[in-house]
Amino acid sequence: MKTIRVVAAIIRKDNKIFATQRGYGDFKDGWEFPGGKIEEGESPEHAIVREIKEELNADIIVGDLLTTVEYDYPNFHLSMDCFWAELAPDSHMKLLEHEAAKWLSIDEIDTVDWLPADVEVVKIIKERHNY
């Protein structure tokens, strides 16, 4: 089975995390943490900065690795490095690829339909509840 390596940013602000709704592809309308594929020769930290700039036109400060999720979708295996992140000072997000976005508190985190691999991340966030 093909493995796809991706990164995701768990962007925190005012005790909320940022979630995006996919606007394209097989998983259209599913909710996820923003991010994308790691390019050959690229570090995960560099990839997440690049992806957030491409998807949200925003600059972020990458924090600690929260977790790496290994998930088997029907046609591929996903390996997803998930990093805590914050918006850089004076940076604002604009949706360039996603259909919608929300800031979610811990009480609201289960109100969206998360993609399967992101469900694993949500479980860890709820267990740690440290954002």
Model-based region annotation:
Residues 33-65, 105:
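The catalytic Nudix box helix
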Residues 1, 126-131:
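Generic C-terminal helix-cap and adjacent flexible tail
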Residues 1-17, 37:
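Conserved N-terminal beta-strand and adjoining loop/helix that marks the start
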Residues 11-12, 19, 85-87, 103:
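Conserved hydrophobic "DFG−1" position in protein kinase catalytic cores
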